[in-house]
Amino acid sequence: MDEKLTTYDPAEDLVSDEAMAVFVEEAFRTEDAGYVAHALGIVARAKGMTQIANETGLSREQLYRSFSANGNPTLKTTIAVMKALGIELTAEPHIREDSVA
């Protein structure tokens, strides 16, 4: 019996704004800039790349290139895309384990 494998696209499962926000939050927790960019690209595809392009003023090609696995978007582009996605970038103090009394 031959097994047929299909490519999994996580964008297909990101159907709610909450799921998209959690997906991006988890990507940021990895502290891997390339993975964060890729995750934002996945969420942008889930939301609709044309819609994101229209809201940011960036071309679809620029978005695909910037938020690919090898992309390196500028902070300006990242903030614009996150705003278009309805995801807020926030900062919290980092609590180091060795500083806990």
Locate each region found by the language model.
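N-terminal flexible/basic segments that precede or flank functional cores
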Residues: 1-42, 98-101
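DNA major-groove recognition helix of helix-turn-helix/homeodomain DNA-binding modules
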Residues: 75-92
